[in-house]
Amino acid sequence: MANSFLDSLTLVRQNTPLVQCLTNSVVMQFTANVLLAAGATPAMVDTPAESAEFAAVANGVLINAGTPSAEQYQGMTKAIEGARKAGTPWVLDPVAVGGLSERTKYAEGIVDKQPAAIRGNASEVVALAGLGAGGRGVDATDSVEVALEAAQLLAKRTGGVVAVSGAEDLIVSADRVTWLRSGDPMLQLVIGTGCSLGALTAAYLGATVDSDISAHDAVLAAHAHVGAAGQIAAQKASAPGSFAVAFIDALYDVDAQAVASLVDVREA
């Protein structure tokens, strides 16, 4: 994993991948700042008239239905169509799927459009796979361990990578399961850390798509980058407000060697 991470982080910072974020209004600014700090370029283009066209020139696309409107649903559908035609990797973040019927129906309708990755908490992933009812809004009520079967089903169904966020992250593809221990509990006290991880996942996939790095390792590296930055930020911050600032700084400052020393990766 270390070599893949070194290469992934280098490619993100060298290539400055352009990430189209169709995301929720609560986290839009934070997501943009996370991408910039990590070395990517954000673009919040989500209107139906422009989404498909932009997805064709972007390096990665994030679909996050956290605060959806009818117009944004249309924009998301168009962006997915544009991404698929252009071969642009797109990431699905199924926010609160299983807990709310309309977004659950929408997510179930697009999951077979071959997302390069799905990133969510355990309850969202379980619900998306049809194995449970979902959590409490953006909060998971299932453990990451419980989501393993659901993640494996979704990985086989989509051909992509499924990432389950929790105290220990789980990264699953058709023939591989990886556990990642990193981060800090303070990450849960700053809104947008999970949603921005979906955007960073799209950045890593976009930066490495033409390389020898697997999609699995690219998704793993994105999660390791965030986890290590969270640990560094927690050492410098005293409360959530200062943590948010320190987290952005750490995403910018951290190098691959530091990340490798801060995270624990286990192949199942």
Swiss-Prot record:
Which reaction equations make up its catalytic activity? 5-(2-hydroxyethyl)-4-methylthiazole + ATP = 4-methyl-5-(2-phosphooxyethyl)-thiazole + ADP + H(+)
* Gene Ontology MF annotations: ATP binding; hydroxyethylthiazole kinase activity; magnesium ion binding
Task: List residues binding substrate.
Answer: M44, G192
| Highest taxon of the lineage | Bacteria
Q: Which UniProt keywords apply?
A: ATP-binding, Kinase, Magnesium, Metal-binding, Nucleotide-binding, Thiamine biosynthesis, Transferase
Where ATP binds, per the record, is at R119, S165
Q: Chaperone: present as a keyword of the record?
A: no
The EC number of this protein is 2.7.1.50
Which Gene Ontology BP annotations are present? thiamine biosynthetic process; thiamine diphosphate biosynthetic process
> What family is this?
Belongs to the Thz kinase family.
Q: What does this protein do?
A: Catalyzes the phosphorylation of the hydroxyl group of 4-methyl-5-beta-hydroxyethylthiazole (THZ).
Instruction: Extract the HAMAP family matched here.
Output: Thz_kinase (MF_00228)
The protein depicted here goes by the name Hydroxyethylthiazole kinase
Organism for this UniProt entry:
Corynebacterium glutamicum (strain ATCC 13032 / DSM 20300 / JCM 1318 / BCRC 11384 / CCUG 27702 / LMG 3730 / NBRC 12168 / NCIMB 10025 / NRRL B-2784 / 534)
Organism ancestry: Bacteria, Bacillati, Actinomycetota, Actinomycetes, Mycobacteriales
Q: Gene name on record?
A: thiM
